[in-house]
Amino acid sequence: TNGWNGQVYCSKEQGQPPHLWKSSLPDVVWHPSDANSYRRGRKKRVPYTKVQLKELEREYATNKFITKDKRRRISATTNLSERQVTIWFQNRRVKEKKVINKLKTTS
């Protein structure tokens, strides 16, 4: 045997008809070339409010690493997702490290 177990390789270069998605609505057909008209992916960046930053900074001053319970509480009070809170703490630690390193190199 050749190790392929009867599987056939099919490259994308071979001519294949484009896949079509049919809507339950009459006369509506979605084609892959329409994909660019509907932007997907990253959301636009929205700056945090002063109230949100104040709460995040207050908690960061207490502890640089956040517990699950504190993350959930901050998420609820600031109207941010738990993921946003986690990433803010990660970014804040990096920012502090940069500032400290910059102070070390200038002195």
UniProtKB/Swiss-Prot annotation:
One annotated Gene Ontology cellular component of this protein: nucleus
Record GO terms (molecular function): DNA binding; DNA-binding transcription factor activity, RNA polymerase II-specific
Keyword Transcription: yes
Swiss-Prot/TrEMBL keywords: Developmental protein, DNA-binding, Homeobox, Nucleus, Transcription, Transcription regulation
Entry keyword annotation includes DNA repair: no
InterPro entries noted in UniProt: AP_axis_regulatory_Homeobox (IPR051003), HD (IPR001356), HD_metazoa (IPR020479), Homeobox_CS (IPR017970), Homeodomain-like_sf (IPR009057)
Entry's localization field: Nucleus
UniProt cross-references to Gene3D superfamilies, sorted A to Z: Homeodomain-like
Entry similarity comment: Belongs to the Abd-B homeobox family.
Purpose of the protein: Sequence-specific transcription factor which is part of a developmental regulatory system that provides cells with specific positional identities on the anterior-posterior axis.
Protein name: Homeobox protein Hox-A13
Species the sequence originates in: Ambystoma mexicanum
Gene for this chain: HOXA13
